Amino acid sequence: MSTININSSDINLPNIQPPIINNEAVKKNDNNLPNDINPPDLQKNFLSLLIAQIKNQDPTDPIKNSDLTSQLAQINTASGMQKLNNTVDQFSNQISKNQNIQLSTLIGRHVMVPNKKIIHTKDTKTQFGIELFEKATSVEIKITDDNNKTLYLKQLKETEAGRHNFFWDGQDLNKNSVMSGQYNISVIAKKNNQNIPVNSLSVGVVNSIIMSSGNAIIDLGESGQITPLSIREILK
C-alpha cells in the first residue's frame, strides 16, 4: 500500500488576513461602553480569531461546518447576553437617577417612620403613631422618660389594622409640661390576649440624602438614618 504525504505548504490557501484590531483606534461606540465589553467589539475580536483559525487549520482535518456553526452561535449568544446586561444596567442607572431626584424633594419635609423614640419640643404638640399588622382587641401606648417614668398613657380597644396617628400635648400625667428632648415610646398590641406585631412611629425632618454604595440613605438628624422604604407617610 502506498503512502501519500501531504504538506500544508503544497496547498494554496486563500490569502485571508485577519483584521488588526487596535482598541485605541476603534471608533468610540455609541453606548459609551469600554471596547473590551462592547458587543460589536466582541464580535470583531471573535471574527479575527476565527479567520486566523481557518487560515492555520490542518488541511488534513479542516474545521467542520458544525464546529463553525457552534462557534458562531456561541458568540451570538454571548453578544446577546452582553447587550441585555448593558440594557439592564442602563435602565437601573436611570431608575436610580430618577429616584434621587424625587428623594431630593423631601429635604426639609416631615416624614413618619418606625422609631422607638420621639423628639419633643416644649409647649408644642408632638405627633406620633402606631402601625398594626392586624386587627387588635386592645392596644396600650406609653411615652416614658429615661428614668422609665410614664408621661403619657393611652389605651385602645378594637383597633383596625393599619396606621393610626396621635398627638401628645407634651404634658405628663399630672398635667405638667415636660422639657424638650427625646422620649421613649412603647406599644403593646393584643388580639384575644395574644401579643401581635406592632410598630411605633415617630416624625422626623429630612436633613439630607446620602448615597452609599449606590443606595440612598435618608438622614433625619436626631432621629437617625433610614432607607426610603422605611417612610410610612410624608406629612404636610
UniProtKB/Swiss-Prot annotation:
InterPro entries: FlgD (IPR005648), FlgD/Vpr_Ig-like (IPR025965), FLgD_Tudor (IPR025963). Keywords: Bacterial flagellum biogenesis. Gene3D superfamilies: 2.30.30.910, 2.60.40.4070. GO terms for biological process: bacterial-type flagellum organization. Pfam families: FlgD (PF03963), FlgD_ig (PF13860), FLgD_tudor (PF13861). Belongs to the FlgD family. Required for flagellar hook formation. May act as a scaffolding protein. This is Basal-body rod modification protein FlgD. It comes from Buchnera aphidicola subsp. Acyrthosiphon pisum (strain APS) (Acyrthosiphon pisum symbiotic bacterium).
